[in-house]
Amino acid sequence: MNIQERFSLRKSAVGLVSVSLLCAIYTSTVAADTVVTGVNEIIEESQVKDEVSIESEKNESLDGSNIEIVEEIADNIPSPVIAEGEVAVEMKVDRGTENVVSRNDTEVTTSEQNQIEVTETKEILNQTSYQTESGEQRQIIWAHGITPPAMEQSGGFVKEKYGDYLNYTAPFEAGKGYYDTNKSLNASFIDLNLCFAAVSSNMVHWWLEQNSSYVERYLKEKKGTVNVEENYAITDLRRYINSFQNQQNSRVFDMFKTYYGYRTNGFVSDALVDLFINGYKPKAQGGVNLEDSQLVPDSRGGFFYDVFKEKKLTNRIFSGSYERFGEDVRTVLESKGLLGLTYRTLGYATHIVTVWGAEYDNQGKIKAVYITDSDDQQEQIGLKRMGITRDASGNPRLNNHMKNNSAGALLDYVHTIRLGQDLWEEYFNPLAKAKETASQTLADTKKALDLSIQGQSELPESMRLIYLEKLNNLYNQGILSIQKAESSEMLSGALENGLNSLKSLDFPISEVGNALAPDLPVGDRSTVSDVDSLSSQETSSTNLEADTENAGIIADGTNQLHFPVEAQTTSSVEAEGDNVFEQEADTLPIIIENKDEFGSELSRNMQTSETDSLVVAVEEDVKNDEVAQVEELLESEKVENQSSELLSDTLIVESANDKEEDRVEAVVSEQPDSIPHQNVEISLVEPTNVETETVVTPINDAATPHGSPTYIDNSVTESVATPLEKDSIQAGETEIAEPTSSESTNVETETVVTPVNDVATPHGSPTYIDNSVTESVATPLEKDSIQAGETEIAEPTSSESTNVETETVVTPVNDVATPHGSPTYIDNSVTESVATPLEKDSIQAGETEIAEPTSSESTSVEAELVDNSEIHAATSSVTPCGSSAYADGSTTESVATPLEKDSIQTGNTEIAEPTSSKSTNVEAASVDNSEIHADASLTAVSSVNLDNPVIEPVAISLIGSKRDTNAEVEVSSLSKREVRKTNTDGLISVQSKVIKKELLESSLAEAGSPLLEATIAQSSNSNSTEIGMSYQNTVLLESNNTERQVSKAEIVMEHKETELVETVSSASEPVVLVENISQTSNNTIESGKNMGVQSQAGAKQILGVEQSSKVSTPTSRQIMGVGLLTLVLGSALGLLKKRRK
């Protein structure tokens, strides 16, 4: 396909050449020549050569019925036009050239009714109006600086009709303000696809001409004189000033051809304009340039970078709907802009033309655009009128079809450019822009006061006119002062004086003042009766001072004034008729961080519904005495609840604090009735002072029936209940230092409860919901056993004052439905428990029940650290009436038993449970340099000092079941901690009680070894297993005041190969292996490598341990040790014999 055919197909898309015509001559070559036969009479000639047969061309060539070319009407009445294209068709036959022209004389008339009447031309918007043949009034908005073409008789537009297509064209006229850069006459390949560059060239030429005064001034400052005839370099701006000579000669277009010639595809016009003005380098894919303050101008352009910097003058928008497109085009033209319009031709190919004007009907709908096209170089055409129609889908189309609105070409993008004269002014006269801004500020203030004066209905009309006249005089004086300012300092002073003079106008605004209502307690309100001036407002009920000198006054068009009021102690302003603050106190969630002092700042902007009222926006400070009721439970009620909870299987962890004033918090938890060994006994030998502080926050959006106190905790809770002497506890990102006390116990319990949403709790069921990070430290003990995490916690009492027998079972619960009277605790948090500073004792944690090894003169330490263990709550759980549930869907960490000068570091190790008669056996699972990865919301306890590191989490899991094919023992580590022994003289013996339902086989190891009896108890209610050691099994050594080191011990427990204990189960055989590596200078025990036996899927692991401690003397301890050992050996042998029988 040659160039002419390609151009013809492109023009057919917009109706300049009939599609039926092209189909008829699908193999023909159309060469268009224009022959001027008379004034305002253009006859289009075309040569049509049939490549198939000359005879068919003689007999079947197109005649007048196929195409009708009509001479331009004398009065040149424009009508809907569609596109650019071939203007004439010349037919050649064997007898010569025959012009097939059918002239409709009925359309060629010069009557006045068909003459275009130019009714008005607006200089500012450059508009012209005319009347169509049918009598419709049309308006044309031209681009800024355009001299509209002649629309009267003898005008330049030619009317051409091709079947149902109607075209109007006009020849190019230089000096009319518009530009028509065309491609090469021979359609050279260098600019074959540079229609985008031609449009960019037109825009640049127009922009340079309209900004000629600024450009000349700029060139004089930068380059000196400009000689247009001189051949400047391609990168010299002076080369392109007044460089458009004709449609085929444009230096700007030549530059773009140099940079973008020989392209096989198109590009975007706005990118090239940005290159020329700012120096933006066009993006490879033609993306829109984003303003970049760090812009470095491209060396090929950026001719006006000093003026505009990174501020672009171009834009690219999608054509959108028909209505939107018409509004966008109008907006651009009326704002002194120019457009490039892209439309689709065949397939996805597009073409772009320059828009110089737009035509609208009397309803404001766009009907046509006036364009120049770079592809009409073969014709003497400048402007073309192309119709705009709305197709069936509501999209705009470039369409010259007179009947079918859905014909023609779909529009694509619109590229725009503006003059940027405001930026020119800022560059040459920075003070001018500042004056404009100052004048606008003064005008806005004047308008606000004007509306305020007119809105005073009680003010007599005569007085109103007097105030308005005074206001106008003050405003004019201020504007005059601003215009006379010769520097920025003078301008600032003039603006300030002008604003002050306007504000000094004193007129009564009592009615407006009625809208000012200070914030009072709910149910009481008052109004402001006396307001003396705009600069000072005083209220009768509240000291409300509004400094209007610093307040921006803004009018909103409905006779309302907005005064941003600044006040130190203000309240929300309430409009008359609006009940803004009538809210229930219990529906406002308030978090109290300090029980003595708290405050909340609420900012509200209120607007009155009346049009003549004043609206004041203030900031509200709520005082302490204005806060809604927050504390619902009294201290006595809390103590009562604690007592009742102790009687109903609730564990309350208490701690002693003798000298140091540390903040103590307790975590209260309960366990279901279905789990055995739930009795909790806390006995205090000496008087215990209990201080309970409870901060209860009302629940928001919670359905809580009558009498059911609900406590929700979504916060970060750290409970410290065990002052440890010379020991520090570090958990996650929290470090706790605890002093110890051996005498009276002072317990301060503080429970912080924060709100939760959408909790339904039946009548009388206290519910505790905790989604927080919890750290608990409990019961200062010197020699004891600790079980924390999701375990039963046994915490003995101190040596001289407290005997504690505790047990805690943590049951995972999610989606809890709590019946009547069932206190429920839900915890989706990271829990850290720190308990019972022990000297050389057993530490147990994490879904485990630990039995202490039996020894007469030895110290055993059994430790297990659970590494990153996650306890996932069950999907659904129902707690029976009267039971208590504690749901924990989080990571549990237990910290227990700081041992003196010992560091227990555990890794992925399994359980070792030794017994020894004369040696010190230490069992620990440890890994060096392990770190706690606590929850991100975990925060440090500010009231606790850090002295010495202690064990973080300690836990041992030993699980076995006769119904399980596998049992799993997992020992892992969360952190490395050092354990230091406290200087104590007392002795604590720990007795572990385990209720057993089924007794499995047990075997003895060697003759000299004490018996370790392992039992597995199957719970009938919870399908959980409990594994315990002996009924009474542990006697600890007496601790000395001097520090001593724990001797090395290496214990290996292995299935069927252990030297100490072999535990045999009917259905499962847990294998436990502990490697004791070595003891460092500070008695660090490291062990690793564990082997676990997995428990049956779905089985819950709930272990219970009851421990009690008694105070004994060294002599009684030895006697008790012998007795206990004898009792254990005897009972074990008896049971074994009975079992074998």
UniProtKB/Swiss-Prot annotation:
Its main location: membrane. It is a single-pass membrane protein. InterPro entries: IdeS, Papain-like_cys_pep_sf, YSIRK_signal_dom. The active site is at residue 195. Residues 1-32 form the signal peptide. Pfam families: Mac-1 (PF09028). Residues 738-749, 795-805 have a biased composition (Low complexity). Residues 526-544 have a biased composition (Polar residues). Keywords: Cell membrane, Hydrolase, Membrane, Protease, Secreted, Signal, Thiol protease, Transmembrane, Transmembrane helix, Virulence. It comes from the Bacteria. One of its GO terms (cellular component) is extracellular region. It is an enzyme of class 3 (hydrolase). Disruption phenotype: Cells lacking this gene lose IgM-cleaving activity and show an increase of surface-bound IgM antigen. They are also significantly attenuated in survival in blood of a piglet vaccinated once with a bacterin, in comparison to the wild-type. Gene3D superfamilies: Cysteine proteinases (3.90.70.10). It is found in: Cell membrane; Secreted. One of its GO terms (molecular function) is cysteine-type peptidase activity. One of its GO terms (biological process) is proteolysis. Its EC number is 3.4.22.-. The chain crosses the membrane at residues 1119-1136. Catalyzes the specific cleavage of porcine IgM bound to the bacterial surface. Can degrade only IgM but neither IgG nor IgA, and is host specific, as it exclusively cleaves porcine IgM but not IgM from six other species, including human, mouse and a closely related member of the Suidae family. Promotes survival in porcine blood. Is thus involved in a so-far-unknown mechanism of host-pathogen interaction at an early stage of the host immune response. Domain encompassing residues 35-432 are sufficient for IgM cleavage. This is IgM protease. It comes from Streptococcus suis (strain P1/7). The gene is ide.
